[in-house]
Structure formats: C-alpha cells, structure tokens
C-alpha cells in the first residue's frame, strides 16, 4: 500500500506499507522539501519513524569530456549520534568509513549505475547520512531506497526508481525488512533491488547469504536454502519492490524536477565503428579464438595498433584526432563479436561450451610455517589462501552503528596489480577488495564451528595471484581448503562459481544465454556477473551485478541450476586435495576452554591480578576470562595449556590433596627447620630439614634448596589441622630400583 500527501508548503511525503502477514508490517516513508534544499534532489527516508536517513543527490554543471566512464560516486556517512554514542576514536569524531558503510555504498551503486543514461559524463554524487537508527534495524536497504528517491527527484536522466528490500526466510516465510532479532531465526538473508518494467519487476542486484545458524536450523528440520528456495525468495521480493517503487514515483510526481538536458558523449560515432569493422572484423574474429588470455590480449593489441594506424592516420587521415573514438569502436566491435559467437555458435572465447568449467587444481600445505594454506587454480585464475589461528582476544573490535561489536572470523582479500600482468598502486584495500573479502567471508560463515566448538580467532587471507575471472569465488574455494588444512572443523566444504549472461534480440524477443565459469573478458562484455557459493546441501552466498535494466527471475533461476552443477564438480576436486580437517599445525597455538563458577572469577584473577599473572608466568600460557565464567587458555604447546588449566581448576574447583600423591612443587619459603613447597594455589606443605639431605645431616636448608627451586615431593602426612608434611622423591633412583617398572602413583603438576 502506498500514499502521498503534502505537508507544509513545499514539503511532500510518500508512504509504503509492507505487509509481512504474521510478522506484522513495516512502514517506509519518504519526505522531501524540508532538509538539504540546495541539493538537486534530497529525501529523508524513515523506517517505522525510528530509523532516519538523509539522501542528497547532486551533479556537476560541466561534464568531464575527457572521461571514458560515468563518474558516479556514492558515499555513506555513519553519524554516531544516530545511536546516541560518542565515537571511540582518539579525536572523538567520525573518521574513515566503516566496513558496513563501504559495503552499503556498493549496494547502492550497483543498481543505480546502470539506471543512468549511457554516455553521461557529469559528475554525480549521492551522499547518504545515517541520522537516527533503531538498533534493531539494518539501514542498508533503506539507504538504497533513499538514494533512488533523491536521484529520481534531481532532474538527472535516470530510469528509476529502484526499490530495494531485505528478505529473510524465517519459519518458512519470506519476511521483508527483518530486524536483527528476527535474523537470528533466519535460514537465509538477501538484499534484492529491482525496478518496475511493464507488468513485472526486473531484478537488478542481489546480495545474499546463509546465516551462522543455518546449518543448525536445517538439522533441526528447517527448510534448507536450496537454489529453488532462493529463486522463490526473488519472486517473493517483487511485490515489496513494486510497492517501494510506486511510493517513490508518487513522490516524484508531486515534487520531482523535470528531467534536464545533459550532454551525452557516445563513446564513438557510427562512421568510426563502420571503419573499424571494415578494417579489422575478420582478423579480430580469429584473434578471439585464442584460448590463452595473454596471447589473446597481445594479438588484440597488435590488431588495434594496426587499425589505429590505418584509419587514424591513413586513408586521408579522416579520423585524425579521434583516436579515442577509434579505440572505443574497436572495443565495441570486440564485444559484438564475442557475444555473436556465444549466441549463434554456443561457443565461448576459449572454445568452451556454455556450461563447461576450466581446468581445476587444488593443493594444500603450500606455505611452510603458516597454520593452514592452500592454492586453488581455475584456468588462469590462481588464488592462495592462508589461515591464521589465535586467541579469541585477538578478534576484531568493531566501532560502527552495527550491533556487532566483535568479529571472530576475518576474511581479507588482496588483489595486487601483477595478478593481471599490470603495474599499479599497492597498499590499503580499495572498495572492491573490501567487497570481495566480505562476499567470501559470508560464504564461509555458515559452515564455521561455534566459539565453544573451536575457541579460536580466525584470520583468512586470500591472495589473488592470477586473475582471469571470478577471483572472489576462487577465494571461497582456496579458503575452504586452507581452513581444513589448518585443522578447522568446518561443517561442510564450500565452493563457488561465477555465472555470466549474454542477451540479444532475435525476432523481436530477448533471448538469454547463461554461461558457467566466466572469463574476465566474458564478465566485461557480458550482461551479468552472478556469483554463487554453497555446500552440497545449500547455497551459502550469492551476488548479482547486471549492466541491464533488470533480468527476469526465471533467467536467474536457470543460472542458479547451472551453478549448482558446477559447484558439485568443484567440490569433488577439492575433496581429492583434502577431505577432512588435518591435524593442527605445530606452529599454531593450542587453545582450550573451561568453565568455572562466576563467583570464583575474582579468586582466579587474584588481588591486582596477582594470581592470574603468576599462572601466566609459570606456565607461559595466555588466559582470557569471560564474564560468564568461560576461560580460554592458549599456549604454544599442549602441556603448558594443561598446566595452566590444572592451576585454574585448583582455585576454582579445589580438591584436597591426599597422602601418597606426588607433585612437582615450587619452594616458596625457607626456614631453619625446613622448606615450604607450593603444591597447588593456596596449598603449601613442609619438607622438614631432616628429609632434605637424602639421609645425610645438613646444617642449613639453603645448602640444598632455595626459593624458586622445583622439587618432586610426596605427601607423607596430613594432620588434623590440615598441615601437610612432605618428603622429597628421587624419581631417577626409584626408577632404577624398579628396573624401569612403570609407576602407578598419580602425579600432578603444581
């Protein structure tokens, strides 16, 4: 349901009510004319009146004629006052955008960019400011709608509006705009954006993932998010997208500017394309049959140089000064020939059929001292995955508007310029690298063990060493292999594949051809990049980007089916490299968790941390204590961790020592009559001076032992007051007497 009304003079609002049946309704309200009046278009978007975003769209007055791309910039500004917080940075003000903000920028950019007229060269900037936020609501999908609405009002040549919704599969129902609390019960979560085309809603962008709890919910009987279920979710999103688009249209009709005349710069004129086609078509068609990327690109460069020389300076120099046009026409001809061959001959650049996968290779343990590593290759795409394990205290701390304050699994993706044989900047990650890392992270989170099952912080790094199509999905495969090599007990292995799409008008009807495992060139010249990751049982993540105004959902459903077949093939190759978790690397720390009563936490810590510091110093272990009484003990080796656990248990779960028990104790005090030895925290015993000399009389205790020395002792007696008498045990002499016979008496380390 939608509604539009005029408030004060010049202030208009439109409302979209989204009905989720048993899950209630969500209300999205768009208001314009009150804030940011000097922007070309501005909208305040509300979600149930608590979450409030301001979106402002502006455009430069003069075009950037020298650009060969559309200069669209999307920025998301998270204001901490939106959640009633002061930033945690040193200067107590917002700094660089958070990962959530960067990912939201990408969510907005991807459906908006193809909606602008082709050839626009004026700089366009969309700035979304988060001004108020209900802590239960993700703001990203509201931002998509706000950005579309402000752009629709701006007078720019924009074929919107674009509607965006988050859909969560909860108890068998697809729910729009779910809260974080509802997402805790969700099996699948996806953001879908689209626009109204005729009587249908065309899908423009999808970003989807299974949740941390998906595997457990499916095991308990919930519907697994299979390809068919995901396709049904795309259909379920359409009515909500339609409602949101209609509200934006009504607002634009009431308050929008007329579309202004903006100069459009076609990449080339028709005469340039005709000249290039006549000069190079035959040679280009042959070059596009070369399977090797580098050989093909070298040959294309040669042909392009010859074409520029021929039509740019020869034949009366009719294209002199129009070299950029000739270059753009050459690229357009390349695109045309690639697409024609796919549509007509069902053959791709490297000679594969539509559903064929390139050669696959998987190997683990490729970096000597890494906790886990793997190399995954698909054709010329080569990804190195490296896993690092450590204490949970090293998990990432997050200072953003998200309710998530820590991140245990961190996935970082690097794309150096040499991966494509080029030079370029290296250093801090760009938005693309952050987005690709987040996609691979979402693909793996549903199969990770819980904190209780595997109490480690996990850092996964994906190094794109060679790129020719879908390094992000290659990263998913390499990461699965690497984590298994590190000994991480994944619930199931995950693989990913990138799908493409080529469309053409034949007899007045649009025909679509889906491609499995696309090359970089097929991504560049095709209409869609559709990445799907999952296990054998269900989809864990997917991402859709399109250059079209939208793609019918039945075409996406077909692509999902092709992706499933390819994923199964890749999983088989990965299983040959490693089928189950390896033993943990000797270089990885050993982390163990134990639970103690909450009222014992203070005793374990001790006054001013004295007790926990002494345990750390004596054993070399690192200890982290949670508020619920969970204690994580990490050490370089198992014995050190066990020693620390014994000491903690002796404090929190004390057991009285018994006569005959043996301990490796520490001398804590000497006196004229003997030495006091610490057996357990808070439990000392006395070795009388007469028992220190191995039967020989000694005059002074310090002649035999000093404070800090380790002694192997046995409890000889415990009197009625609990005082413990000890005797020194000479294990070597005793073992010699027994001829190496095994000792049955229990020993404990203090």
From Swiss-Prot:
Its EC number is 2.7.7.8. One of its GO terms (molecular function) is 3'-5'-RNA exonuclease activity. Mg(2+) binds at residues 523, 529. One of its GO terms (biological process) is mRNA catabolic process. Residues 589-648 form the KH domain. Keywords: Cytoplasm, Magnesium, Metal-binding, Nucleotidyltransferase, RNA-binding, Transferase. CDD domains: KH-I_PNPase, RNase_PH_PNPase_2, S1_PNPase. InterPro entries: ExoRNase_PH_dom1, ExoRNase_PH_dom2_sf, GPSI/PNP, KH_dom, KH_dom_type_1, KH_dom_type_1_sf, NA-bd_OB-fold, PNPase. Belongs to the polyribonucleotide nucleotidyltransferase family. This is Polyribonucleotide nucleotidyltransferase. It comes from Saccharopolyspora erythraea (strain ATCC 11635 / DSM 40517 / JCM 4748 / NBRC 13426 / NCIMB 8594 / NRRL 2338).
